[in-house]
Amino acid sequence: MSEVTAQNGDTVSVHYVGKFPGGKVFDTSMKAEAVKAGLFNLARDYKPLQVVLGKHQVISGFEEALLGMKINETKEVTLPPEKAYGRSGNHPMAGKTLLFRLLVTNIKRP
């Protein structure tokens, strides 16, 4: 594994699988996982998500989980509603605990 660790300001490329606690996949950046979960969409471009850490481009728990990760590192995290879409609100995932499997594929320093 690379010794470079993700920090604020870095652009991190990350593959992910998002699941509910029961194991049902709700989103993924990986084509094979989408096919397996019955979520495959021909119009979607399955590739790593690019996130600039510290810019709040993704839910807070997702961003926090990426901090300190290395290239080719995999991590599984459980995000309570407070670290995802909040306890309540209009978002369909508000109030839900979410699980993510993350795989960092690249880290680019500014």
Where does each model-flagged region fall?
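FKBP-type peptidyl-prolyl cis-trans isomerases
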Residues: M1-P110
